[in-house]
A protein has these predicted regions:
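Extreme N-terminal starter segment of soluble prokaryotic enzymes
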Residues: 1-4
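Cysteine-nucleophile active-site neighborhood
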Residues: 48-115
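Amide-donor transfer/coupling interface in amidating biosynthetic enzymes
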Residues: 68, 101-193
Length: 193
């Protein structure tokens, strides 16, 4: 099985590549639209700011490529957020593949922003490789609206989608490459879908 990692020129792409390679996948890092379109599976990793990420996406001419994909596309952390319509972060228009907006997490007594660390999942669709009670690792300050695409949630002041699925799209707000066995199961399920 092969997977193309969309290389926007920053982020946690190396650790994601290693996580896929440990599962036996052949990994290609590229920003070439033709290579992305020819891939069996595509992953859009990301850390950082939505505005910068969408600026890089547009500068590399990848918006149309990504929005036109019909093969499995996995968004990881910021990459998942980019699948939605827009983000409050820098009032950014995103790819618009999933209805909803990305909103800033609000600090509260006992809760810090960014949300960093391990959180327990409530899973409604185990076909993604996750199970109820799994703990996965988060590092984020913004989260998507909870909606029909949500297949696993966590709590951090509010219910946040930890994983989403819609048509050919799969997303993880958490970092599967840092989430031990649960993260490996999630990536393995993506490779098998």
């Amino acid at each position: 099985m092969s997977v193309v990692l969309v290389d926007l020129g920053y982020g946690n792409i190396g650790s994601i590549a290693v996580a896929f390679q440990r599962l036996g996948a052949t990994v290609t890092l590229t920003a070439d639209p033709a290579e992305i379109e020819a891939a069996e599976r595509v992953a859009l990793p990301g850390v950082g700011a939505a505005g910068y990420a969408m600026g890089r996406t547009d500068a590399l001419g990848l918006r149309e490529t990504l929005t036109g994909l019909t093969k499995p596309l996995l968004g990881i952390c910021l990459g998942m957020q980019l699948l939605f319509e827009g983000s409050e972060e820098e009032d950014t228009a995103c790819l618009g593949l999933i209805a909803g907006k990305v909103r800033k997490l609000e600090p509260a007594p006992g809760l810090t922003v960014p949300h960093m660390g391990w959180s327990r999942l409530d899973v409604t669709d185990a076909s993604c490789g996750l199970t109820n009670g799994d703990y996965v690792y988060f590092a984020h300050s913004f989260a998507c609206d909870d909606g029909p695409a949500s297949i696993a949630t966590a709590r951090h002041g509010r219910t946040i989608p930890a994983a989403i699925r819609q048509n050919n799209l799969l997303g993880a707000q958490f970092h599967p490459e840092r989430s031990a066995e649960a993260g490996a199961r999630f990536l393995k399920a993506f490779l098998a879908c």
